[in-house]
């Protein structure tokens, strides 16, 4: 429907260019739902990938961690969580150079019996299928614990993303209002650490696609361009394809 209604939109034109391999990557600040649907139809999912996911890098005390899913899918099953862990592990190995990234499941408690039936089943599935699964993680530890990958459904993930974004802006504004001039440089450094203007990759597609916020600044687009170029040069799509081909041939 989106493709038929707006065939000449900049988003669709860019996706078609990516499909035809006339460009190496695509970046947009357009509607997220339209992007996911259109890219899945035009670019297609990598064989073996169950669902395309939004996987932003969230800054914290130890650098950053990958959050997935951050808004692409609300309804997930245990196999989807395993699939997400696999996708994010490949992405983490490329972006952070960590070949054995830890995987946590966002939940209301650390016990394996906590959460909804889907989360309980996802815990069991990840425990059996993913060697680097480290169990549940409560939200209060997101900012001060060393984690590499944090899994949740898209509804919860989008709330986490927007809450941390809003909270960071609020705290920085409070510091600006209350601090004296001599602390201005420290505030600028904090802003660089808690940078929520960064872009988000759409993992699972047969092409490199980045999503920026609708109110993104030039810094966000600059980051997206640099990240897209990096992922292309490091052959992210080939590496994901090769991983899932290996699974299918076993």
Map each language-model feature to its residues.
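Glycine-rich phosphate/nucleotide-binding loop
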Residues: 40-53, 59-67, 145-150, 154-250
């Amino acid at each position: 429907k989106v493709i038929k209604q707006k065939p000449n939109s900049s988003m669709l034109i860019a996706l078609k260019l990516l499909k035809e391999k006339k460009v190496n990557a695509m970046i947009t600040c357009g509607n997220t739902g339209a992007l996911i649907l259109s890219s899945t139809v035009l670019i297609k999912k990598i064989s073996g990938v169950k669902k395309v996911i939004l996987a932003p890098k969230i800054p914290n005390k130890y650098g950053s961690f990958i959050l997935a899913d951050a808004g692409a899918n609300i309804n997930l099953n245990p196999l989807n969580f395993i699939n997400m862990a696999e996708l994010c592990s490949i992405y983490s190995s490329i972006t952070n150079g960590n070949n054995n990234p830890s995987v946590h499941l966002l939940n209301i408690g650390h016990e394996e019996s906590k959460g909804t039936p889907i989360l309980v089943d996802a815990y069991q599935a990840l425990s059996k299928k993913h060697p680097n699964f480290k169990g549940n993680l409560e939200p209060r530890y997101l900012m001060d614990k060393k984690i590499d990958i944090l899994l949740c459904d898209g509804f919860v993930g989008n709330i986490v993303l927007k809450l941390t974004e809003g909270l960071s802006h609020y705290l920085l504004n409070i510091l600006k209002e209350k601090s004296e001039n001599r602390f201005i440089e420290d505030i600028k450094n904090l802003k660089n650490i808690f940078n929520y203007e960064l872009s988000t990759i759409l993992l699972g597609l047969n092409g490199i696609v980045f999503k920026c916020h609708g109110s993104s600044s030039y810094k966000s687009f600059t980051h997206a361009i640099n990240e897209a170029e990096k992922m292309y040069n490091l052959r992210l799509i080939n590496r994901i394809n090769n991983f899932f081909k290996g699974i299918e041939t076993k």
